């Protein structure tokens, strides 16, 4: 373990960054932090902290404030009815919208290259990051090249 200061340390190929006090999550259960060019959403779920990429891969919109289901370990993107497992990042449901909405979007995609890419985008999991609490501080771990 290599300690740089009280804000970060390395452990193998993991760079650990101190992002917040655990008590700060009592008022705001979800918070977003920029860690080594990664925008990370950390959510307090019970007594645990889960960290994941903060933006849905479908359209790049923020998942801050999205509903969490602790029984199924899911976060639900509030924009396109997509859900992900917050433990492993796998897709649970991908753009689960009614058929008429899909047809409407496909029609408009004929006129927009960007919209066409979003409509045709394959299921994409979210990145998951490690967390730990040390002396009442929440730390997030990022893999770095050796």
Which functions belong to the PLM regions below?
Residues 83-93:
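Short metal-binding segments enriched for Cys and/or His
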Residues 54, 80-81:
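Glycine-rich His-Gly loop
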């Amino acid at each position: 373990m290599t300690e740089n200061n009280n804000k970060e340390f390395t452990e193998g190929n993991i760079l650990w960054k101190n992002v917040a006090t655990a008590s700060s999550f009592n008022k705001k259960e979800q918070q977003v932090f920029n860690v080594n060019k990664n925008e990370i959403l950390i959510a307090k779920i019970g007594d645990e902290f889960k960290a994941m990429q903060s933006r849905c891969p479908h359209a790049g919109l923020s998942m801050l404030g999205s509903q969490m289901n602790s029984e199924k370990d899911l976060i639900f993107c509030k924009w396109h009815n997509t859900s992900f497992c917050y433990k492993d990042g796998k897709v649970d449901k991908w753009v689960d919208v009614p058929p008429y909405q899909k047809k409407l979007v496909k029609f408009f995609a004929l006129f927009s290259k960007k919209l066409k890419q979003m409509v045709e985008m394959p299921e994409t999991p979210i990145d998951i990051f490690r967390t730990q609490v040390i002396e009442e501080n929440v730390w997030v771990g990022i893999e770095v090249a050796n």
